[in-house]
Amino acid sequence: MKKFVYIILILAIGALAYYGTKEPSGRLEKNEEDQHAVSGMSEKLAGDYNEAGLTLYVNGSEVEEDEYKPYVSNNLHLMMPLKMLKDKMKCTYIEYVNGSIVIKRNEGVARLVLDSQDAELDGKDVKIADAPIKKDDETFVPIEYIADTLDYTCEYNYDTGRVSMQKVGEDSKLPAAYDMRKEGRVTEVRDQGDSGTCWAFASLAALETTLMPDEKLQFSVDNMTMNNGFGVEQFEGGQYRMSIAYLASWKGPVLEKDDPYGDDKTNSKLKAVKHLQEAEIIDDKNLKAVKEAVYTKGGVETAIYSDMIDADSSSEYYNEETHAYYYDGSEGINHDVVIVGWDDNYSKNNFNKAPKKDGAFICKNSWGTEFGEDGYFYISYYDAHICETSVVYTRLEGADNYDKIYQSDKLGWVGVLGFDQEDAYFANVYTAGKSEELKAVSFYATDAKTTYEVYVATNFEDTDDLANKKLVASGEMEYAGYYTVNLDDVVKLPDEKKFAVIVHITTPGSKYPIAIEYDADSMTDSFDISDGEGYISLYGNQWYSAEKERKCNVCLKAFTDKTE
């Protein structure tokens, strides 16, 4: 069945597209002047369509973010940003440094090559009229050629500018087994030694996978564990919120070669080589969502209970021959690992004590290659703690993504605040520099299905000015986590004047939906209440000072670019 449809209301356009991409049998003589005329008309039409703009719908919902918008090629074909296929169509893709691109969804596999018309769709070699191309550092692919392979239809109407991507049949079906190692999407196994740094090894190993195989970087564990701002020594351990806070505040990551592990020293002056702008915290024991994250986004950091401490340890819960671990007791979590794959058919008989059914996650450990299967092992789906907390780092950008970050919550999400109901308002006030425009804000969703509206108030003098707010963005987060929201339109900020960013947040089932930084215990002794001006409100009309009345900072950052 043909699964992509062209809706073209102007017959001349249809004829032009046909003439430019398909030859009849026999010999057709065309002189250079004819070819130039056809090419010129195609380019002009493509330019007109792109200038008018295309509206993208995926499964009936409009995709409003500009970063996902397609464009019309000079051959009058749709070119779609590769990341849209991952983020909106739940495909997985890998870009290799040699230009090869592999895109998968369900059983379909499309193999393309950057700047080449040679392709392989479901094992068959084909020629495509438009080669994948890099444009403004983004990879675009000819979607109508591969939509069928990915179980999607592609309908577009040149007259209205509407592009519709609609899945065919069931939701994405994950394979029964998947292993990031086979896809070249993991970095080397490392050894934490006798320090309590598993949490940082897991966080950074997961972070590294989000870049692979296009970029292969190794990040510094010493820098994360010794420069995070928390009052914790390396031997004392840590957890994922510390990792997110360190990364979200742009303290890191830095490269391992610039701050090597195990030398008992660090360099706090190093600059982050990447900027984390988003991390998803997946629902408790949502195994399907964890698999989808591994398949489409990157390795997933999770925590387990382990009575082993290194590669030389043994445990009644660990089968050394099969490298299989299953714990069904009541002890709490004490060790972080990274999920890099799964096998639904991994036999329950591989474990010392058989869980109720087959199935296991493939996990990367931080005890060196002498442990397990070259540093990896299998954890049963039915382990007491696997996937209770699952973190995937989903938006890691270059260190030049914004010119400036405004923040007062360098320790990140320490606690929560609210008014005993699921929604609330919170705001942060900052003083702009010269010639700046506000591009984005970031904050935490403390649980799944959180909705938000983001507002901006310029020329702030007191809380009365918060009533003069302008709506600049809205949306929903599927999972808890840390998110950066791009504004619908940039906001020019008055030079050296105060401005306020305001969020109305709704978290179903929550009584305290606002993430805050405060002095909770000895770990947060470095908390600085003097560096922020935050406010909270129930209805957005009466505001309370976060610092003066609640002794906290609200977690709400702002990102700007220079205009000159």
Labelled PLM ranges:
Residues 481-483:
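Short strand-edge motifs at loop-to-beta-strand transitions and within beta-strands
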Residues 5, 16-176:
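Primary recognition of N-terminal secretory signal peptides and signal-anchoring hydrophobic helices
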Residues 85, 146, 471-474, 553:
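Extracellular/oxidizing-compartment recognition motifs
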Residues 168-479, 512-519:
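Catalytic-core signature of thiol
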Residues 7-12:
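Sec-dependent N-terminal signal peptides
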